[in-house]
From Swiss-Prot:
One of the record's GO molecular function terms: oxidoreductase activity
Metabolic or biological pathway, per its Swiss-Prot or TrEMBL entry: Secondary metabolite biosynthesis
Cofactor field: FAD
Disulphide bridges: none
Domain FAD-binding PCMH-type: 35-206
Keywords for the protein's UniProt record, in alphabetical order: FAD, Flavoprotein, Oxidoreductase
Enzyme class: oxidoreductase
Pfam families named among the record's database cross-references: FAD_binding_4
The protein, known as: FAD-linked oxidoreductase nodO
Entry-linked PANTHER family: BINDING OXIDOREDUCTASE, PUTATIVE (AFU_ORTHOLOGUE AFUA_1G17690)-RELATED (PTHR42973), FAD-BINDING PCMH-TYPE DOMAIN-CONTAINING PROTEIN (PTHR42973:SF39)
Amino acid sequence: MEVSSSETLPILWRTSPPSNDYENARCRVFNGRQPEHFPLAIVKANKVEHIVAAVKLAAELDACIAVRSGGHSLSCWTIRHGAILIDLEDYQHLSYDDEIHEVQASPSTLGADLLTFLAKKKRFFPVGHSGDIGLGGYLLQGGIGLNSRGYGYACEYITGLDIITADGEIKHCDKTENSDLYWAARGAGPEFPAIVIRFFLKTCPLLPVCKRSRYVWPAAMYGKVFKWLEELLNSLSEDVEIAVFGFVLPRLNQPGLVLHATAFGDSSENVREKLTPIIKNHPPGTFLAEDFVSTNFPEDYDLGKDTMPRGARYFTDSVFLKPGIDFVATCKGMFTELKHPRALAYWQPMKTNIDRILPDMAMSIHSHHYVSLLAIYEDPSEDQQQISWIIDRMKSLEPAILGTFIGDAHPVERPSNYWSEEAEERVITIGRKWDPSSRIRGIVLSDA
């Protein structure tokens, strides 16, 4: 590893051709479909002083800054051409305050590691649906994670954070101190104008029993399945996470639907009661029916690696739909007309018997229906084809779209709104105040 004039700064400089160490560090991301962008240098920070030095180096060189936590973002925003890339993989901190049930975690902390750490204390935090998602990008983008229908968005659990500004100053942010940055940290995503070095997060009591009901139908059952679920959500326990995937049935080469209903509780009896409305009333005609199966997050994360392996090529787009639309009619094509054998459509309903009111934070787009399309493939020659069919499908939904999830924003291919109008103005104002040169921000709102 090449070292700068400061012996304490672990830095890899771009060379021509790039060194193997540089290229391995540049491409430490989940998505095999990566932009041909080359950071000016990559800093493998393992302490705060490295991060501060990297920020000051960027200012000296008039370079932008990219920050990588887990590298799971499918948009690969951290591969920013000509930037100083600060990779936080080796910058690790994880501690717990027993008195206030609060965890302190570095942005590089992976979801699976946080769950394991908290389980020993009989506590829980709603991390992402993949175990190797780092907290940094996940929380800044809002945190649509485990049972968001019941737990809400993960960013709502942020009680404070330590940050480094674009000038290299270390500050704390919470409801009373630098409250504008605290507001922005909960949903501004890549437009957050500082670098998070520590999150302070409230935790929940761990519900120790986790069971799942799983059913697979042919896509011809789409109308019956989705109408049944829409009606069911009004009375279904908030401790039940509903997820429906549209996919191509293996060997049959026809579209299918799979429902995962995952429930959490204190006992098997308690969980069975929560799943009973699904077990007893699900529509007939299934290819596969599993009424009450034990599951856990490590198993789920391992199974997820089979469907979404690291290094495959990905493209995704995710939106919230307007209240009052005919959801079943609007999304039928998404789930029944998948164009590629590994493609996935996804519905995560947020509806409960009481409408949730979001706290005052940057994350301001919310509705009962969150839907997503995902392309998974291996051949680089398919890039444009895979991107186009998803963008075209999402454009066809635009009359029904309330807003786009900031983590899957495509401001060039499909411009959208990622916050409410008022929240977007605040994101811009806070960004200009704390990062007037757009050294850190500016990926989505490039003209702000």
